[in-house]
Amino acid sequence: MRVVYERCAGLDVHKKTVVACRITPHPDGGWRKEVRTFATLTDELLNLADWLRASEVTHIAMESTGVYWKPLYNLLEAEFGVVLVNAQHIKFVPGRKTDVNDAQWIAELLQHGLLKASYIPPVEQRDLRDLLRYRTSLIQERTREVNRVQKVLEDANIKLSSVASNVLGVSGREMLEQLIAGQDDPVQLAQLARGRLREKIDQLERALTGRMRASHRLLLKLHLEHIDDLNAKITYLSAEVERLFVPFDDLQAIERLDAIPGVNPTIAQTILAELGKEMERFPTAAHAASWAGLAPGRHESAGRNRSSRIRQGNKHLKTALVQAAHAAGRRKDHYLGAQYRRLAARRGKQRAAIAVAHELGVSETAIR
């Protein structure tokens, strides 16, 4: 079999250890295969790099095992050609002998060019991804915390959400603070309304008539404090993301994406961070949508094509595009809104959102 890399190595990565197998030419012909085990502490990983460097290894392959591959990749990527491989791909490559350990098998597959490398973005893009994904998790946690506030109010029979569109708006927040402080007079609470909400004073007085207990006040206090803390962290992260985006990509790209129905600046940032600038790795815009997990599987049998479950993809990009699709579905002045409503009536909102998200994925890739 043709040899692609004469000096290469395979790494079997675990939480506490890394088993490495390096393959180099033997002076008498054939190949020398050496196996060593290293701990995953930084000094041991540096020893691993020295060991590979001593034999002039040029390329290394390893499986994408959890998050354990990341420290190794960060340490080795500057000096070696590192190939990160999906474990499922290695599993289904035929020809493995039962007495060959994982590291040696990975090294042999790499030596003959039989591994398909996963795409790993540059470190700047990886940093952006980490920050944006954490910001998304904080936003989701804030939503859960707001729902907990609603649950406490319902338990106390305070129907503020039936009158105020935003319970945590300026008026709603002041009312909640007074409830926490012990104020239970609905007339006094309703007078805290501002703006257009003052037109609903009578409704507010009825909605704010409930039965607040000490436990309700304590829970509301803790929930609001948590929401304030989350808001501060989200604001801080957003400012840091804006700073990191300046060298990563021009602001015009965000503006172009922001012009697409359903896409706001936050979603545009997620799309750029997940897809990156190297769009040439996608032959077509449809390939990018498929990478996001927005293309249905297709099986052909007896000359007939059958759709199957949507393939797994980048869940963070998919979530952002589906969120944009739901927003686009509310548009009355765009064909995507009409498409969403038509599909939702026949097949449900979730399937409609997936279909529109696919359209958005194709559009966003095409304008890059």
What are these regions (language model features)?
Residues 1-368:
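A detector of single, family-specific signature residues
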